[in-house]
Amino acid sequence: MDQTNETKILVVDDEARIRRLLRMYLERENYAIDEAENGDEAIAKGLEANYDLILLDLMMPGTDGIEVCRQIREKKATPIIMLTAKGEEANRVQGFEAGTDDYIVKPFSPREVVLRVKALLRRASQTSYFNANTPTKNVLVFSHLSIDHDAHRVTADGTEVSLTPKEYELLYFLAKTPDKVYDREKLLKEVWQYEFFGDLRTVDTHVKRLREKLNKVSPEAAKKIVTVWGVGYKFEVGAE
């Protein structure tokens, strides 16, 4: 699959009829579709191939979608949409904490899936595939950290940092208003665009992952994301 220039999507679900349905609608949009029928196969394919997006069922026998997401996130920033059933809100929260970018509730409209896929691919393409040599002006520059918003490119001490679309959006939202404190509810509303009635720990988990990624490149850059105890988070210009 990696030998084509097509947009490649991995569809993961233990139900063959759902895989067929999603394949049919997504191929109409000229996406190249690959399938996995269980979590272990999804992990193997997700780590070996370079997919542009993964549609991932949450509840599967054996290795579930949360574990699949967690293992892929350890190695890659591939955009992931979780497919969940009604009544699985607690598991959806775990999915966000594991690193999923969005979720769709079953039973779903195939057209909604296509729209969500297009929206996430659009954000991901801005983050991952923009030509970094294109001149841009919308750049936030701080000591040890710069954020080129037009290119969706983050560098810490001169080294590019690979972030998921949601991690990037969270960092940029905080950094564009330095020293302003945001509570978790505000961050959920502004960064997670879709309706979400989940656990506020989702924000904490994304902040933790963001700090870890920055810290691997520049501990000074990671310190700029500051916890305001009992309130929320802020981006502190002078923090080093």
UniProtKB/Swiss-Prot annotation:
Residues 137-237 bind DNA. Its main location: cytoplasm. GO terms for cellular component: cytosol; protein-DNA complex. One of its GO terms (biological process) is regulation of DNA-templated transcription. It holds the Pfam family Trans_reg_C. The keyword ATP-binding does not apply. Residues 8-121 form the Response regulatory domain. Phosphorylated by ResE. Keywords: Activator, Cytoplasm, DNA-binding, Phosphoprotein, Transcription, Transcription regulation, Two-component regulatory system. The modification 4-aspartylphosphate is found at residue 57. One of its GO terms (molecular function) is phosphorelay response regulator activity. It comes from the Bacteria. It is found in: Cytoplasm. Interacts with the RNA polymerase core. PANTHER family: REGULATOR OF RPOS (PTHR48111), TRANSCRIPTIONAL REGULATORY PROTEIN RESD (PTHR48111:SF44). Member of the two-component regulatory system ResD/ResE. Required for the expression of resA, ctaA, qcrABC and fnr; activation role in global regulation of aerobic and anaerobic respiration. This is Transcriptional regulatory protein ResD.
